[in-house]
Every structure is written in C-alpha cells, then in structure tokens.
Amino acid sequence: MHWSHSFYERQDALTGCYHAPIHPFHTSLAARVTAHRGQPGPLLELGAGGGQFTIAAALAGHRVTALEWMAGAGEHTRLLAAQHGTTVQALTGDFYTADPGGPFDAVCYWDGFGIGEDDEQRHLLSRVAGWLAPGGTAYVDVYTPWYWAHHAGFTRQTERYTQTYGFDAEGCRMLDTYAPREAEAFTQSLRCYSPADLCLLLPGTGLTLAEVWPGGAYDPKAGVYHPEVPLGESMMYVAVLERA
C-alpha cells in the first residue's frame, strides 16, 4: 500500500491537525490569494484537509470547492463552515480521477505536492490547467531540497510521539517520520523541486511558472517557526502558475 493511503489519517489521529480551528495563517493566506487575484471568485482547494483554508477563503468572498481524498475530512470542513456562517462544497475523491467541476479562477494546493513521481506530478498539473478558467491562477506549495537536506536528522520529542526529519538524496524527497510511543512509525515522502527543477517539469502540462513566493522555515535549534525567510532558507515556496 502506498504511504499516502494511511499517513494523513494516522497523522490526524496522532496530532489532531485536521480537526483544528482556523489559524491566522489561513486567513492571511486567503487574503494574499485574494489580493493577487484582484477579487474573489470560484476557487478549488486540493488536499483541503480539515477545511481551515477553505473556510478562510470562503469568508474572503470566494466560492470554494474543497477536494480531499481522506474520508471524513469533509465533515470537519462543513462543521467549520456552519460555525462561521458560510457555505462551501466539500467533496471526497482522488485528485487524479475526480471531477470537481469548474472552471475555477484559482486552484490552491497547500502542503502536499510531490506525493508521486515526476510523471504523476505532470498528470496532476495537467488536470489543474484544465480546471483553470482563462486568466486563472494556480497556487502550489512546493518543498525545497536544500532545507530538508540541511535539517535531515532533526528529532522532536513530544509526550505521544517522536518526529524526525529526513532526506532521500537519490530521490530528492523530504521525509517526515512520526513514531508513536506504542505503534509502528509512519513516514511522509514528498518530491522536492527547486524553481528551476519545477520549470523542467512543466512543459506539456499547460502551465507556466509566473512567480515564486518564498515560504517560511522551522528553526529546529530554537524551536521557532519563521513565516517568511529568503528562498534559499525556506522549507517550501508557493509556485504561482498560469496557463501557458
């Protein structure tokens, strides 16, 4: 079984990350997308998790469709929507086969790109291009190889689990392993791309790289997350993609 078929459910069971409230980060991110687009509009979020960004975007005026393959995640999205007095369309399905409708002015995929191999990434990006309306924009979090190579071996202890960062140098993949106190460890493995590498992936997908927004970085020694750092220090960046 592919690691992604169980990782996110086990991560949520261990940390509750998909059942959390909306964080100011989600509100800020929704505001940034709205400002970049110039106005709210139809928006698709892939890998919506518990719907925190989905609801933040809806509160910013977007008409949001949330697509998440993990069963049950849509329930929390709908719960958040009710709590905040808004409505969204929450769908459960595979990104590679589901039909979320559209077209969309914006497609967002946060913290999950790189699950498969290059051909699978190309296939997904081709689908994203097909979902975009003319003049639409895709916003995709992409993990950087340099951060994960530099911080491989970092370990964080909590009462319930140990978390360890790793890096597969041959496959250029970040590794994020959770080891519960009394259960088998499980690992997330995502393909990392520099902006130059991403540009090599895009031909034939119908998308082109328009901008790069450097992301943040977690400082393991200080135990502090810095939300904005230079690209050469960031854990990930947002690839702003437009139809070619």
Residue locations for each model-derived region?
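Conserved class I S-adenosyl-L-methionine
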Residues: 1-41
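A short glycine-rich, Lys/Arg-flanked "PGG" loop and its adjoining helix->strand segment in the class I
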Residues: 122-134
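Class I SAM-dependent methyltransferase SAM/SAH-binding core
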Residues: 52, 56-97
